[in-house]
Amino acid sequence: MYKIRQHPSRRHRRLVLWLAFAVIMVVALVGWTLILKSYVAAPSTSSTLSVKSQPSPTAAHSNTLFFGNVYFSRYINDWSMASPLKFSYPFSRLNEFGRENYDAWITGLECPTVAGLQQTSAAEDATLSFNCNPEYLKEARKWFTAVTLANNHTDNQGLTGFAETQEHLKENSIQYFGHPDPRELGDICDVIALPAKIAYSNGSTKEGSLPVAMCGYHGFIRIPSQESVAIMKQYANYMPVIAMPHAGKEYVPAADVLKTELYRSMIDNGADMVIGDHPHWVQNTEAYKGHPIIYSMGNFIFDQQYNAEVTRSAGINVLFEVKNANKTELAKWLAIGKTCASYHDTCLEQVKKAGLKKLPYTFTLSVVGTDDSAHIAKPASAEIQAGILKRMNWLTTITQLAAPYSGK
């Protein structure tokens, strides 16, 4: 029997087919492996964006201007209603101060704002019991960040009128602090959200808020107790504390001994600085233990017109700066700062819970002279500015300030 042999060319063809199949499988396997590696190694665009580091805050500053007595009653209201500008009349030249160059304006509101209550200027002049139309606050909100209510007129319409005033301020997003009765210890200090500019690690600048304790003291009718002054210690280890007292003898060029001792005690109890009003005149200043004390700024928007003493005032420009803070801690402060615009907020408790300590602030002070002669508040002339600085003894005071406080 003969064996049938396969033809050599047929066997060669089968071998080639098997080899080709093997090569294809190897190439496919290698290609699939490379695709998998590429997928794992190169995350999607969205994944890349999600892990990209965010810029960190590196510094913060708030250029803040403090003003003296403000109210919109009595003859201010008469002049306003006689003007085609109506409720915007008292504010009609404030743009000349360059509001856009400041982060915040803070003043003292010296009248309640009760809706529907109309009093003649003659009656208010006779009784010295004031009321301001709440419509003025709709204009005031364009300029002022916060007001102190610690004075001898915010309760002229009783505590009900005072509470209504607080509500109208809230409606107009104007922060407030202080109480006409210094025995109301829970209302003396409040943490406000101080508007600020924040610098970031990528070179950008954004708006933010810094928690700052503002403390209002009414000391005209009764002297604030040591207990009330000591309240500032609760805030002093955590944030800047600004005392804004309303006290002392009126229409005199310098603080008396009693007022001097009271304001100095505020520094001893934790205030970074004291910025006062009430006497209707600009008064002296001093550096006490290196801290600035401004005894009286004078009238800013007021209806007294009979001489230069009552129409000029000293706006106090304070530049709050934080330059060398821990970035993580600064970010935490800024996050809390967003929540501090409400009255009686929980900002101090949040700061304590977060274990934060006071940021390394510096404070630079200067004087912006104002003049409300001819019924309208506006920047002071060079001559009036010079007189204000002389009354304040400003050049001597700023040479005696100590770090972190300085002046110019």
Language-model features: where?
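Acidic, metal/ion-coordinating pockets
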Residues: Y2-Q6, L17-A22, L29-K408
